[in-house]
Amino acid sequence: MLEKIVRQIIDGRDISRKEAEFLIDVDLQQLKQAANQIREYFCGNDFDLCSIINGKSGRCSEDCKYCGQSIHYQTKIKVYDLLEKEIIEDIAVYNANQGVGRFSIVTSGRYLSDEEFSKIIEIYQYLNNRVKISLCASLGLLNLEQFNELKAVGVKRYHNNLET
């Protein structure tokens, strides 16, 4: 059954709940070999690197115990508002020249203000037109319209931290 599941995944088909539950009891070594077979099919021996820039630092209202950006803890991180377009462009160009395939602006906070989001859209539009690198984003919670705006200016992937 494990081989059948591997083939389904490689063929781009979903597995059923029953098949997923089957994987719980598979020998760990066999499971690792199956996962490696899937990885080799989709990725070969390459990896996809996304470099990030801390586009806005500190003063986050969230209370993530591990995070130095939270206002709930005294840390020594630099606190600053959204970086200027030229600073972000310089870092994106540097990464592209180093062979990095993806670049993401990461901002602290649950949300960006409307003004900050508009500025981010301008920055991504600028990068998309001038820097040969795939664009990603990690900007907190967004609505559908904001996701569509990011997509329209060339953002291909969205990173999200899911904490339990």
State the predicted function of each range.
Residues 1-61:
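Flexible, acidic/Gly-rich N-terminal and inter-domain linker regions that tether
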Residues 12, 35, 64, 105, ...:
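Conserved, mostly hydrophobic/aromatic
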Residues 33-37, 60-70, 155-157:
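Short, charged low-complexity intrinsically disordered segments located at boundaries
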Residues 44-87:
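Canonical Radical SAM [4Fe-4S] cluster-binding loop centered on the CxxxCxxC motif
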Residues 72-164:
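Core AdoMet radical
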